[in-house]
Amino acid sequence: RVVELLSPFSEEEIFQKIGHTPIPPYMKRLDTKEDYERYNTVFGQNVGSVASPTASLNLTEEILKRIEEKGAKIVKVELKVGWGTFAPIKEENIEDHIIHEEEISLSKTAAIEINRVKEEGGSVWVFGTTVARLLESCADDSGMLSEFTGTTNVYIYPGYKWKVVDHLVTNFHMPDSSLILLVSSFAGKELIKSAYQEALKNKYMFLSYGDSMLIL
């Protein structure tokens, strides 16, 4: 069933007036004024995500400046994190799991820039699993990217052949999530298991407001 709501206010005005910052349900608390500022990335502008792409929460304008001073080119993409990012995998066979769709957009300019880096032998460093899914969704079998706006349900788990991403920055995820499968696919199950054991031993912070790791 589809319900149409008639209002003199725009969607964004309604969100700003009565909406709440969509902090993850596992926090088990109401959002606060601090969340409105802290639970958004330095890139965040448009409304629509049910959660923040949390790897980028560790970035600041100062860090971005230092990255650029090292000679790196920062390329921005647009994505809207979907509700399924919190959905646990309940199937015994992970291949039977149906992945959630997320809205993504890769501009022509961004695609050209990333393709140029790959063609010149450079590396693509990605912040976040959602960005990783976005890039892999927009690439052909040879790894070349094309402009795209739409949805993706690309499901990445061990055995997947990566086409674009060379290095990945990501937070520590829930053990029964599609996100842990994605990072295990990228780095290998045993390495991720070892990294998580090290994180637990040293009391790293997990999940959205937690620490992140760089997978080389």
Task: Please identify what each model-predicted range represents.
Residues R1-L216:
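Surface-exposed, charge/polar-rich loops and edge strands
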